[in-house]
Amino acid sequence: MSKVIGKVAQIIGPVVDVVFNGKDVELPKIYDSLEVTKKDGTLLVLEVQSHIGENTVRTISMDSTDGLSRGYEVVGTGNPIQMPIGPDVYGRLFNVVGDAIDGLGNLPKTGENGLPIHRQAPKFEDLSTSSEVLFTGIKVIDLIEPYAKGGKIGLFGGAGVGKTVLIQELINNIAKGHGGLSVFAGVGERTREGNDLLREMLESGIIKYGDDFMHSMENGGWDLSKVDMPGMRESKATFVFGQMNEPPGARARVALSGLSIAEYFRDGAGSDQGKDVLFFVDNIFRFTQAGSEVSALLGRMPSAVGYQPTLATEMGAMQERITSTNKGSITSVQAVYVPADDLTDPAPATTFAHLDATTVLSRKIAELGIYPAVDPLDSTSRILTPHILGDEHYNCAQRVKEILQKYKQLQDIIAILGMEELSEEDKLSVSRARRVQRFLSQPFHVAEQFTGIPGVLVDIKDTIKGFNMIIDGELDHLPEAAFNLKGSIQDAIEAGEKMLAEA
């Protein structure tokens, strides 16, 4: 098919109108990508959003439109934006349009080497329905809101309560222990965090650049000529970034770009068998935020709180693709920024509907110095049932929630009248609840550099044993501080006895 050629007719920020003159010209389809070569030789990719008038299409640019002017030639590709696939994508970093941003050269992404970013969700009969627990080694998560393998997990929290640290710890714990493939989509977050994450992945061996490169990195260098390209195929992760400084078009599409690579890993192709994939998104709110910017630029009438009228449709189209099939599974962990700590805001509220487990991070708990600042009473999981987890786990989780709920109800009385006015039974409940609350904290591997405490993974059996001992009153003699930032109950007992001996 011959390529359709048009001209730039109007530019308003990231919105570019393209006119296609000539008789019987076939306009590009919705979501097709168009390409413009700027004067400096860089290629700008546009995505068709709507047809306006007889020969004109309205597009959103995937990069800055600086330097573009009316009259520039635009070439239709005949396809949506394509992402590269195949064994060479392991260990690589891409942007929203599938170009490499790690300085190691682009990969082919046309024909059988590429996948479009806009695809249908798997058919109903292809879906997998098994329920299996994915243990993370993080006490509060494994006990109170266990994650399902092949499920969708949301980390909700306002600014600065620890979403990115928690997602990095999950990558560290699950990606290392899971041994499978991970895809990380950085959507509208800080570029610095992407840089930190890449260095962390190299140090932990999840991404392999080879020994020569690692020696140069240890000495403060970043010599890409030393990267072992064939050895990179042994890597276990791929990154797709569209960070805060990108135009809204890129931020609105980068989650889909990452998802296409995750779908390729899940379904396999040719000799590649389907696999179990971990798909991390930081931050899904920025996907909604960028969609709202794009919607306003395209002149659509906003709905509640200024969000796009198509919010539920866009979220549904993306979330329904993140699922497990008979070939493989995608377990997705999505950080969700909560504007002004308001969980009823349309963006987090729309995301809630799609999730199997929710981990809510609370500023009040962060203020107490308890990290991870997970709110055990607000967080939920679909698989917190006795027939999936067993009676012992389920009963322990319910006892922990019960004692924390009782403490929460008594807090007003304590604030007004003080502890002295409580009954002996209530005083005992409060002291045990405070120990439980502190024991829900845990030192993280990725936070070692600023806590100075080595990170730990805690087995679920140790977690259940520890909380049962606290609630049964076996550790009432130990000071509360002994339970803060400890891994297993044994660590807490040792610390407590040491404190008593020193007192």
Swiss-Prot record:
Alphabetical list of InterPro entries matching this protein: AAA+_ATPase, ATP-synt_VA_C, ATP_synth_F1_bsu, ATPase_a/bsu_AS, ATPase_alpha/beta_chains, ATPase_F1/V1/A1_a/bsu_N, ATPase_F1/V1/A1_a/bsu_N_sf, ATPase_F1/V1/A1_a/bsu_nucl-bd
Protein's cellular compartments: Cell inner membrane
CDD domains assigned: ATP-synt_F1_beta_C, ATP-synt_F1_beta_N, F1-ATPase_beta_CD
UniProt membrane topology term: Peripheral membrane protein
E.C. designation(s): 7.1.2.2
Major subcellular site: membrane
Catalyzed reaction equations: ATP + H2O + 4 H(+)(in) = ADP + phosphate + 5 H(+)(out)
Source domain of life: Bacteria
Keywords recorded for this protein, A-Z: ATP synthesis, ATP-binding, Cell inner membrane, Cell membrane, CF(1), Hydrogen ion transport, Ion transport, Membrane, Nucleotide-binding, Translocase, Transport
Binding site for ATP: 157-164
Record Pfam families: ATP-synt_ab, ATP-synt_ab_N, ATP-synt_VA_C
Family to which the UniProt record says this protein belongs: Belongs to the ATPase alpha/beta chains family.
Subunit and partners: F-type ATPases have 2 components, CF(1) - the catalytic core - and CF(0) - the membrane proton channel. CF(1) has five subunits: alpha(3), beta(3), gamma(1), delta(1), epsilon(1). CF(0) has three main subunits: a(1), b(2) and c(9-12). The alpha and beta chains form an alternating ring which encloses part of the gamma chain. CF(1) is attached to CF(0) by a central stalk formed by the gamma and epsilon chains, while a peripheral stalk is formed by the delta and b chains.
Matching HAMAP family: ATP_synth_beta_bact
Role played: Produces ATP from ADP in the presence of a proton gradient across the membrane. The catalytic sites are hosted primarily by the beta subunits.
Protein name listed in UniProt: ATP synthase subunit beta
Species of origin: Flavobacterium johnsoniae (strain ATCC 17061 / DSM 2064 / JCM 8514 / BCRC 14874 / CCUG 350202 / NBRC 14942 / NCIMB 11054 / UW101) (Cytophaga johnsonae)
